[in-house]
Amino acid sequence: MKNKKLVVVLLCLMTGRLMAQEAKVTPLMSKDLTDIPGKEGVMITVEYAPGGSDPIHRHNAHAFVYVLEGSIVMQLKGGKEVTLTPGQTFYEGPDDVHIVGRNASSTEPAKFLVVLVKNKGAPVLVPENQAKPK
C-alpha cells in the first residue's frame, strides 16, 4: 500500500514538473500586411519557466526574436547552439527547423518577444513532425 502511494505521489510530482516546463505564449497583436497580399504580422511573448523548453518545431514564417528577461538557448538545424541574454536577438527563416529552444537557467524564468511575418491564418508554430505546406 505504501509503495502504491509513493508511486502515485512521484507520478504527480513528475507530471507537475513537466507541465510547469511548457512555454507560455501570450498573443499581443496581429495585423494584416495589406501591401504584402496574404501575409500578416504577429507579435507574441514567450515565457519559459526555470528549466522550460520547446519541442522541435518550425514557424513557416520569418521570426524575429528579442530577449526581454533571463537567458535562453536557441539552435536551428545545421546551426550552432547560441545563448542569448536581454537585448540580444535571433532570427528564424521560413525553412528553418528550430531544434533547441530552452531556458538556460534551472532557477530563473526567461521571457522573449517574437515578431512573425507569416501566411495569414497559418499557425504560429508547427511541430517538426508535420509536413511543411507547399
Describe the predicted segments one by one.
Residues 62-74:
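Short, conserved beta-strand element in jelly-roll/cupin
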Residues 27-31, 85, 98-100:
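Short structured motifs
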Residues 38, 58, 66, 83, ...:
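Extracellular/periplasmic catalytic domains that process cell-envelope and extracellular macromolecules
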Residues 33, 37, 48, 78-95:
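Short acidic-glycine-tyrosine-enriched beta hairpin
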Residues 29-62:
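N-terminal targeting signals for Sec/Tat export/insertion, comprising classic cleavable signal peptides
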Residues 81, 96-122:
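Ligand-binding loop in jelly-roll beta-barrel domains
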Residues 2-42, 75, 91, 109, ...:
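A short, N-terminal "cap"/entry segment at the start of jelly-roll beta-barrel domains
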Residues 53-55, 73, 90, 94-103:
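Histidine-centered metal-chelating micro-motifs
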